[in-house]
Amino acid sequence: MSDDDFLRVTDVSKWYGEEQVLHDVSFEMDRGDVTVLIGPSGSGKSTMLRCVNRLAEAQEGSILLDGEEVLSPDLDVDELRREVGMVFQGFNLFAHLTAVGNVALGPRRVLGLSETEARERAEDQLERVGLADQLDSYPAELSGGQQQRVGIARALAMEPKLMLFDEPTSALDPELIGEVLEVMHGLVDEGMTMLVVTHEMSFARAVADEIVFLDDGRVVERGPPEQLFERPEEERTGRFLERIASHD
Amino acid sequence: MASATRPATVRERVAESDRSVGRLLLVAAGALFWGWLAVSWVNRWLGGVLVPVGQPLVPPAAVEATLAGIPVLAAYAADAGFVVEMTPDLARGTWLTVVITGVSLALGFVIAVPLAVTRVYGRFSAWVSLAYTELLRGTPLLAQLFVLYYGLNLASYVPDAVSGVFAREVVWVAILGFTLNGAAYQAEYIRGALESVEEGQITAGRAIGLSKLETIYHVVLPQGLRYAIPSWTNEFVYLIKYSSLAGFITVPELYYRADQIAAETFRYTLIFLVTGVMYLALVLTASKLMVRVEERVAIPGLGAEREE
């Protein structure tokens, strides 16, 4: 563990009421790394992800992002979220805005760009995710895969230093998953730092620098994909991967 | 898609032409009503360029004579002449009703939006908003008007800057009363609509760094206010009708004028029948207008799940 880790999560614990959902979770990432959180549903991986941009509040532990304590009560959370992009399982596109409107809202209202600049940036980002021909479509007029790509463009338009993906393909029909993964592959190639919660094991295997396996709110095992997938040290990891594989 | 190419049955064609005849009649009646109102107002405003102020736009005697010549309508000729004679008063009353309703509705909306927002997203302020809403909805509107007019004597506090806008200061008291009361009802409709905006919309707004207030302004309100239009139209329609309560604090709006005419002439049935038609015209206009507004601001997919 070096001092210049880009993201360092240390002993993060979280309770919902009486129930503890995260138990001393720790992991770290360098700039440009891709870390994939895997685990059964209810294992706390989405909650962990949301603690990083404070959509969920961890009660204990420390999350250092670029040297700054994310969990500090003095932190300006809006400032933090400006720099950390997030992509949701359910897309959560603004239903009253077109694709361009969705992507331009942050640059316009949060970053303070002019109307024209914000629109230009939105168009560039939509082009980046392959939606140059759907600029003025409303979310309801787009397929799930297209909506999720708008969601990615919306996060990218803020020029984040870290991207969080919360099961970005789980709500998609199988034939639409590919187009979203393709965009994500592209981001990996560009060197984006990404923390990803997903069940797409082939994606995880192909791009992850490290896999973190969570079960019951605890880190069971973590390591590079070849190690975790080929020679898991923990029995639970092996069982989980077998179960997942049999569904593929 | 077979049904789209199937020739319409006779019954369907009759129904279709009935509908278009109905629509035509409605448009004609609307044009007549608003034309009469507008011309009357312009005539009065310009000091009687068309006919002397206080005179009907068409001479009652002429109407009476014309109708008397038509066999089926001859029996109603005298009544029609009487009604035409009363139209200047009715036009003034109707105009005031329109103004009071429009101004109160707009001012009420300005108060209702923050009320609804604090009710849904506030903490302490949610209780203040709830208390306001319950107090204003839970007491009779007429009693509220009496408190403002007789109790607090607010008519004597109307600022000089606006006291000349209407012939009498009491009109402002009525507008204040309807604004405060209507805001409570409007807030209830808007609150319901805001609550139906999905939680994920707010999460997404916060996730790109918008503050809570900015998220409400840029994300929740544009959606929620669109959802609110159909139920909010109810408040519009109610306000047109309960603006007649202003008559009880001596505001010379439509009901007040009708009541005065009736008291002087004892033609209660006829006058209130005609007055009823005036209110009906206003209400129909309001609901048609709001349907137009709803269509105008509609966004594909937004609110579709609510129509199921």
Regions found by a protein language model. Name each.
Chain B
Residues A2-E308:
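Transmembrane alpha-helices and adjacent helix-loop boundaries
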